[in-house]
Design a protein with these regions (language model features):
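Conserved PLP-binding active-site segment in aminotransferase class I/II-type PLP enzymes
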Residues: 1-64, 68, 90
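Conserved donor-binding loops in enzymes that form glycosidic bonds
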Residues: 6-7, 77, 127
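Short active-site oxyanion
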Residues: 46-48, 71-72, 120-121
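Conserved PLP-anchoring active-site segment centered on the Schiff-base-forming lysine
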Residues: 59-114
Length: 203
């Protein structure tokens, strides 16, 4: 049987794990600092925080957005289970949106329905690395938390996005060769490094 997800760990990464164990240090260290710097350089963002899990990151993002407890957060029906579980545990109400059968993404019409039903924030999961049409979604004006755990490294041709052109992103450092990386469209971005994500970490 061919596994859909197959995590790997290289000798260099194993050596890093062993080094941490030998150092007998608990808490943020050199590797944590290097990871943050790499993320900032790759995504051309001004700030990043390394946390143990994407669920913890989601909690901080919702707190930063000052979302009231009991508010509805829109998520994809194909979103990983941790998103639903985390929202419930933090006191929010998941508004599950159906997906398009052709690409597995939430449609703009479905997001509109979610907003009409009281959805305050869109937690945008880019299923299996498939990138949505950001132009139409951004026009809705709803705050977006992008989950790029499965799409990290992908980019969008700005020539295909009429509303996300130079007038909106003239000074955007994330735009290179008229392409904009996923993770730079939302208010906050979550990059999970779990075993089924596109980039995995050793824990």
């Amino acid at each position: 049987m061919i596994q859909t997800y197959s995590t790997t760990i290289r000798r260099k990464e194993m050596d890093a794990v062993l080094t941490c164990m030998v150092d007998e240090k608990i808490g943020p260290g050199e590797l944590n600092t290097r990871l943050i710097q790499l993320v900032k350089e790759f995504f051309k963002c001004d700030g990043a925080v390394a946390l143990r899990s994407p669920a913890i990151a989601l909690g901080y993002a919702l707190t930063a957005l000052e979302l009231e407890k009991g508010s509805k957060v829109m998520i994809s029906a194909l979103a990983p289970a941790w998103q639903y579980q985390a929202l419930v545990s933090y006191g929010y109400v998941p508004e599950v949106l159906d997906v398009n059968e052709n690409d597995g993404l939430v449609s703009v019409d479905e997001i509109k329905n979610g907003i009409e039903n009281g959805g305050k924030i869109l937690l945008l999961h880019e299923t299996e690395g498939i990138v949505p049409k950001f132009d139409d979604i951004l026009e809705l004006g709803v705050p977006i938390i992008e989950d790029i755990s499965m799409s990290a490294g992908a980019s969008v041709d700005l020539g295909e996005l009429d509303g996300v052109g130079s007038e909106r992103n003239g000074n955007d450092k994330s735009i290179v060769d008229n392409r904009k990386k996923v993770g730079s469209f939302g208010v906050y971005t979550i990059l999970g490094l779990e075993e089924k994500d596109v980039i995995t970490a050793g824990g």
